[in-house]
Amino acid sequence: MQTTRTPYSVSFMATVLLLFLFACHSTIANAAVALGATRVIYPANQKQVLLPVTNNDPASVYLIQSWIENAGDQKDTQFVITPPLFSMQGKKENTLRIINATNHQLPSDRESLFWVNVKAIPAMEKDQKNENTLQLAIISRIKMFYRPTHLAMAPEEAPAMLRFRRSGSILTLINPTPYFITVTNMKAGNSNLPNTMVPPKGEVSVDIPHAVTGDISFQTINDYGALTPLIR
């Protein structure tokens, strides 16, 4: 029996193929270019901090572009990242320098959130320039916490200070500390709740099924990207 492909089926197959190629390329690119940390802590008394970038692929060259965004996802000039653009050969490591240009304009009683963005653009081989080749740039995005000196408590003490308030199907997380608290593996009884990040001296609300009962348990992510002990 002969099967006639409709425009819909062709379009569908093309979409599936494109998504498959994107997933494969993303996996390769993410494995090739890696950052040396999952988050950056910027102490206020330092003029700069360093972030290593490594190209683990011996055969590929990448153009690396970097920039800083604020908590509102807008490019921000309060921190300068250098070099902002450079070429990276295979099996090489480079170091990004993040320089404080805030001129003491940020709050001194709590952390401030920024984002470090590093885009890896694969170089095109000469024999590919006349071909219809799909080139995908991958952006690695990690948090940067600007941390003032002489805060009222140590960051390790912050998770235990987190408080909870429930109203029906809304659970509010209240953070009285000067630190951002990244909450993960949160449960009410045996029910999983969404991961979230609570700003310093602020609060965040998440949905909780109305019928769910039980004590709240959670973990947080520390300065090194590791999980802290379970808190109940």
Outline where the language-model segments fall.
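N-terminal secretory signal peptides that target proteins for export/translocation
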Residues: M1-S9
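N-terminal signal peptide c-region/cleavage motif recognized by signal peptidases
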Residues: C24-S26
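Beta-sheet-dominated interaction scaffolds and their linkers
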Residues: N30-V53, M153-R163
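Buried hydrophobic-core signal for structured, non-transmembrane domains
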Residues: V49-N55, I98, F114-V118, I170-I174
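Short acidic, flexible loop segments centered on an aromatic residue
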Residues: D57-Q74, P176-N192
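Intrinsically disordered, low-complexity Pro/Gly/Ser/Thr-rich segments with frequent PxxP/GP/PP motifs
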Residues: D73-Q105, N190-D215
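Terminal connector regions
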Residues: N103-L151, E157, L162, G214-R232
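Intrinsically disordered, low-complexity segments enriched in serine, threonine, and glycine
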Residues: L162-R232
